[in-house]
């Protein structure tokens, strides 16, 4: 009985992990391959920018595809198409048929199908969590733990794979992860949509935006978290590196600081998964926002390495629970027939927040 209740959620989490670890490995292997193939930083930058734009567009429209065609078909197609796109890169390169524009086309195709696949998986989490006897808050936190573990372990795994096999075969491994994630998703997810959709307008982002705007809790919560995520993302990718460079600090210190923040975030999510249901979301967010503000103020002084690492872990710990809290609120307050579009809208806006 216990296995029947937990196995669907475990299968979906396995698909999520494969998807995330594949993307984390590709985030290292793909730039390495592009630079080796094109010998141009400009082409590497163009490839990265094209990938981000394709991912955001895929997030905008992907939720509507999930709600219209069903979760299993979208998960399967996203995984297979993304895998084929990644596998095409080393295969075309092996036969000497990979041009720079063809390389970008493969990357864009794979990136565009990332978000629909994740929306298909995430839309079913509340139901499978209920079957497993877990609260929405705990399921949301467990999913975040899986994503963070993949994000932390992916670069190390990617570096080892590139060192042993090379960048091209490593991209083949990411393709395998994508296809397997799609197959697992198709196996455990429902094939039919939550409700039949008859108009193409509902495929757009408008339905998701309209619902978020009209929902009295989600509207302010989403706005606050979006700003917070944008600031935290800018801190990690722009502000802290700039401070380190201006102060003449070592790049190894920056790398260790980033790792400590990631480890702290993982611990924060794990704590929220364990005791989050006992504490109100309002109190969690108040502690996260105020604590991270104080931590960021102290970080701006660039203290010695031990204190710097401790502050990095502390800020990560405090901010780790923010995303699971938002996701849990979305799961609790969004009708099933709208969940794909709402998740797609949230994903697209969050992806846009940090670059802006």
Which stretches of residues belong to each language-model region?
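Juxtamembrane intracellular "pre-TM" segments in multi-pass secondary transporters
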Residues: 1-10, 190-223
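Substrate-agnostic recognition of the 12-TM MFS/MFS-like secondary transporter fold
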Residues: 11-27, 51-64, 70-82, 102-160, ...
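A single, central transmembrane helix in multi-pass transporters
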Residues: 29, 165-172, 210-269
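Transmembrane alpha-helix termini and helix-breaking/packing motifs in multi-pass membrane transporters
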Residues: 31-37, 89-95, 153-173, 245-247, ...
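Juxtamembrane helix-start elements in MFS-like secondary transporters
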Residues: 40-48, 103, 136, 250-258
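C-terminal transmembrane bundle of multi-pass solute transporters/carriers
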Residues: 57-61, 68, 72-77, 88, ...
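A generic transmembrane-helix signature of 12-TM secondary carrier transporters
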Residues: 79, 83-86, 92, 106-107, ...
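Hydrophobic alpha-helical transmembrane segments
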Residues: 100-111, 138-194, 201, 255, ...
């Amino acid at each position: 009985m216990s296995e029947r209740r937990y196995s669907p959620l475990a299968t979906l989490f396995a698909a999520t992990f494969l998807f995330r670890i594949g993307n984390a490995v590709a985030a290292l292997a793909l730039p390495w391959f592009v630079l080796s193939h094109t010998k141009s930083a400009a082409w590497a930058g163009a490839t990265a920018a094209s990938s981000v734009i394709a991912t955001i567009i895929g997030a905008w429209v992907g939720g509507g595809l999930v709600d219209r065609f069903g979760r299993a078909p979208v998960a399967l197609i996203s995984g297979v198409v993304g895998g084929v796109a990644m596998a095409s890169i080393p295969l075309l390169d092996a036969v000497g048929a990979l041009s720079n524009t063809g390389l970008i086309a493969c990357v864009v195709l794979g990136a565009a199908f990332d978000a629909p696949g994740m929306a298909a998986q995430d839309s079913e989490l509340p139901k499978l969590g209920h079957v497993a006897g877990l609260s929405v808050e705990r399921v949301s936190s467990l999913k975040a733990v899986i994503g963070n573990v993949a994000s932390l372990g992916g670069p190390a795994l990617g570096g080892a794979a590139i060192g042993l096999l090379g960048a091209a075969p490593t991209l083949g491994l990411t393709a395998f992860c994508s296809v397997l994630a799609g197959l697992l998703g198709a196996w455990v997810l429902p094939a039919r949509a939550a409700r039949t959709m008859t108009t193409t307008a509902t495929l757009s982002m408008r339905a998701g935006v309209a619902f978020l705007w009209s929902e009295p809790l989600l509207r302010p919560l989403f706005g606050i978290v979006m700003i917070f995520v944008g600031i935290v993302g800018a801190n990690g990718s722009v502000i802290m590196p700039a401070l380190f460079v201006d102060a003449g600090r070592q790049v190894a210190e920056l790398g260790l600081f980033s790792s400590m923040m990631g480890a702290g975030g993982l611990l924060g999510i794990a704590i929220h998964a364990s005791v989050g249901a006992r504490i109100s979301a309002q109190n969690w967010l108040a502690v996260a926002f105020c604590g991270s503000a104080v931590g960021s103020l102290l970080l701006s002084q660039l203290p010695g390495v031990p204190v710097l690492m401790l502050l990095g872990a502390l800020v990560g710990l405090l901010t780790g629970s923010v995303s699971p809290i938002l996701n849990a609120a979305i799961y609790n307050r969004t009708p099933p027939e709208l969940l794909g579009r709402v998740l797609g809208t949230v994903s697209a806006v969050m992806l846009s927040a940090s670059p802006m």
